[in-house]
Amino acid sequence: MNKLPHETRVVIGMSGGVDSSVAALLLKEQGYDVIGIFMKNWDDTDENGVCTATEDYNDVIEVCNQIGIPYYAVNFEKQYWDKVFTYFLDEYRAGRTPNPDVMCNKEIKFKAFLEHAIALGADYVATGHYARVAYMDGEYKMLRGVDDNKDQTYFLNQLSQEQLSKTMFPLGELKKPQIREMAKEAGLATAAKKDSTGICFIGERNFKDFLSNYLPAQPGVMQTLSGEVKGKHDGLMYYTIGQRHGLGIGGNGDPWFAVGKNLKENILYVDQGFHNELLYGDEVIATNVGWVSNKAKEKEFKCTAKFRYRQEDNKVTVQIVDENTVRILCDEPIRAITPGQAVVFYDGDECLGGATIDEVYRSGKKLDYLG
């Protein structure tokens, strides 16, 4: 027998932002037994000695007091360092462009936090993510959030049946302007707080400065694939495939873009033109595959895929190589497919799962210059 809301304990992860504040408010209004948890994943004292986590936690305290729910802070710094930040540095060291948000959701928010919540007697965990969970045909499905502009299933692609069975996304049916309005109407302390952007542990800091604290920069040559030297780069880790800004190449003609990396010789490859053929791939090998249903649909199937967060859906055919690897054949060549990033699969609104981009091909030839 299903429990009534007031008998159902929901532990919600609260960041001190407007989204998780409204998610907590909605759960409370729906009658659930709600506990707010602030996750401290990073020691983020800035140059002025101000710890933004302290400010965020103070906002959580204020909102929880306004809503009338208990709150706690939990420190996951060690798990975060071991599972997310170490991966982040390893990928950059290997010349790739990682996606720490995907790893954070997999290892921290829906693993360490979920385990902690269950220890607190939780029936469910909740977050302020823009996504939906539906139980259909005997399994849990993850659907895109109604707000196309804010949908976050791309970052949640590694969640499993077990995790989804214990997860609530109260904002999934709402759009951002509605959430701001609800926060305002309820007089929540976070109603006008601006959204956080970028990688959580970098915050407002300069990316180059931050990364150089952990990985020594190794400047090198910037050249075309044919060997024409165009300048110097500050370190391969500071550049991603398709990047235009920060190259410092002047002159006439089309703008210059980073098109590849040679890790062995520490060369950044560049070329001209947004639609330069060197930036396009039509086949991908991806590893670390995770399926929301815990299994692939078939050995080969058609669906759509996103190769980065802010991207239209692309029609693809997915071929299962083994339980950890897929081959993705794109209907049309796609620009700036980047090793290390997530590729996420969809069937309409349903997120099927995702994987990590490993190798990129064009017309059957591996693009070795991608690093």
Swiss-Prot record:
Keywords: ATP-binding, Cytoplasm, Disulfide bond, Nucleotide-binding, RNA-binding, Transferase, tRNA processing, tRNA-binding
Reaction equations catalysed: S-sulfanyl-L-cysteinyl-[protein] + uridine(34) in tRNA + AH2 + ATP = 2-thiouridine(34) in tRNA + L-cysteinyl-[protein] + A + AMP + diphosphate + H(+)
Pfam families from the UniProt entry: tRNA_Me_trans, tRNA_Me_trans_C, tRNA_Me_trans_M
The enzyme's E.C. designation: 2.8.1.13
This protein's GO CC annotations: cytoplasm
Disulfide bridge partners, by residue number: 104-200
Region (Interaction with tRNA): 150-152, 308-309
Major site of localization recorded for this protein: cytoplasm
UniProt GO molecular function: ATP binding; tRNA binding; tRNA-uridine 2-sulfurtransferase activity
Single GO BP term: tRNA wobble position uridine thiolation
Residues binding ATP: 13-20, 39, 128
Subcellular location(s) of the protein: Cytoplasm
Active site (catalytic residues): 104, 200
Statement: the UniProt record of this protein carries the keyword Iron: no
Annotated stretches, region: Interaction with target base in tRNA: 99-101
Site entry: Interaction with tRNA: 129, 341
Protein task: Catalyzes the 2-thiolation of uridine at the wobble position (U34) of tRNA, leading to the formation of s(2)U34.
NCBIfam families (UniProt xref): PRK00143.1, trmU
Protein family: Belongs to the MnmA/TRMU family.
Name of the protein this chain belongs to: tRNA-specific 2-thiouridylase MnmA
